[in-house]
Amino acid sequence: MKRICSVSSVQLFSRSFRALASPRSLNYPLQCIKRSSVRMESSNFSSGVRTESSVKPRGALIVLEGLDRSGKSTQCAKLLSFLNGLGHPTELWRFPDRETSVGQMISAYLSNKSQLDDHTIHLLFSANRWEKRSLMEEKLKTGTTLIVDRYSYSGVAFSSAKGLDIEWCKAPEIGLLAPDSVLYLDISPERAAERGGYGDERYERVEFQKKVADFYQTLGDSSWKIINASDAMEEVEKKIQQVVLDQVKECTEGKPLSLLWSS
């Protein structure tokens, strides 16, 4: 088992984000951010993503979001089985990825084994996604559909619910790949709290989850599909499948990749 990094490692990591976290360094990017906007690239950028009409078929990037205990993990697993059963190469990813060195620090924090400043843990969550960014692009461009259990929206919603500025929270996420579709599993915090295992981790408190839900509503855009997570599990599963199959078809027809929250 990997050893969880020490607090001193967190301090070193946090200092490496000092330029990003300072208001001065964020001044220009924040002027350019447009809420819930995605820029379609028309030429090469540093990671090599292109969006000309000649783009080859690719995998779809499907993100499931929602409050804690909304059923995301269950539906992600069902969707994985469904797509693989249809012959679509598909993988299931989860954020945070607790297997990486950064992910282990996050895991310790979420299980109340360590204490971190709110800004520091937000940047760690963001770094955890950046750790997988190149591999994510590679998988998509070679035809693998990715089902992602939580993505940048969770990071921004949860940190904003703690009182951090929402635009500050979005800034470190700019440049990550934008999902082709976001499926938001909508459930009341009170209903979610009735489900098994609720309260095991730091953020599983009804009043806090209400704040998170409000910020999710702020972040939602045209790529989001709202699914009533209080419906029967089979009904939720069917609705998700319908949305995802449409996206998979578009991506196999050459739908271009795009970037998250870029003007």
From Swiss-Prot:
Determine the domain of life of the protein's source. Eukaryota
Main enzyme class: transferase
Q: In which tissues is it expressed?
A: Expressed in root, rosette leaves, flower buds, flowers and siliques.
Please report the organism this UniProt entry assigns to the protein: Arabidopsis thaliana (Mouse-ear cress)
What is the gene called? Answer: ZEU1
Transit peptide, residues from-to: 1-51
* Inducing stimuli: Cell cycle regulated. Up-regulated at the G1/S phase transition and then decreases rapidly as cells progress into S-phase. Not up-regulated during the male and female gametophytic mitoses.
Q: Which HAMAP family match?
A: Thymidylate_kinase
Q: What is its EC number?
A: 2.7.4.9
User: What is the protein's known function?
Assistant: Catalyzes the conversion of dTMP to dTDP. Involved in the regulation of DNA replication. Is essential to promote the first division of the zygote.
Reactions it catalyzes: dTMP + ATP = dTDP + ADP
UniProt GO molecular function = ATP binding; dTMP kinase activity
Instruction: Look up the record and name the pathway of this protein.
Output: Pyrimidine metabolism; dTTP biosynthesis
Instruction: List the InterPro entries hit by this protein, alphabetically.
Output: P-loop_NTPase, Thymidylate_kin-like_dom, Thymidylate_kin_CS, Thymidylate_kinase
Q: What cellular-component terms does GO give this entry?
A: cytoplasm; mitochondrion; nucleoplasm
The consequence of inactivating this gene is: Embryonic lethality when homozygous, due to arrest of the embryo sac development soon after fertilization.
Q: In which residues is ATP bound? A: 66-74
Gene Ontology biological process: dTDP biosynthetic process; dTTP biosynthetic process; embryo development ending in seed dormancy
Keywords attached to this entry: ATP-binding, Cytoplasm, Kinase, Mitochondrion, Nucleotide biosynthesis, Nucleotide-binding, Nucleus, Transferase, Transit peptide
Record's protein name = Thymidylate kinase
Family as reported in the entry's similarity comment? Belongs to the thymidylate kinase family.
